[in-house]
Amino acid sequence: IGFIGGIIEEKIKSFGFKPISNLTGHKITTGLLHAGIDVPNIKTDDPYEFREGEIYAIEPFATTGSGFVSDIDQVEIFSLYSFNTVKMRQSRQILNQIISERGLLPFSERWLNKKFPSRLTISVALKEMLREQIIRAYPVLKDSGDGLVSQTEHTILITDKGNEVLTK
């Protein structure tokens, strides 16, 4: 995998940009978007080799800035962390919707706004779920050097002949 990161890094640099070193692609398994194996955007010494049948999101991140991102105080993406319950009835309705439609996959407050008309109810429910550690919050990321960031993604299946691009 470290070799693949080197190829991604070279390609990004050939266009005059910097790869973002602390963001990666990742292995995907059924119901689990980030399955524990990262695909770097820079060359590393990681000796792991792709195996037939595995699925990966290859996600080159490029920037005009520093090549490193950090969190800002804004959250737009969440994911289910535990199957505990909440006290408020509206929070339970929202939690049940998340479980039935998203499971462990990430979701956004914007997605909930399409399902539930009250932004205040959604905000209170999300705060309750965060406090009870039922969901995780993912802060928005920003280039540390204030550069512009781009990202693209292809999902690939590793086959006996190489790979098959699943996103087209």
Task: Give the residues covered by each predicted segment.
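Active-site neighborhoods and metal-handling regions in enzymes and metal-associated proteins
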Residues: 1-168
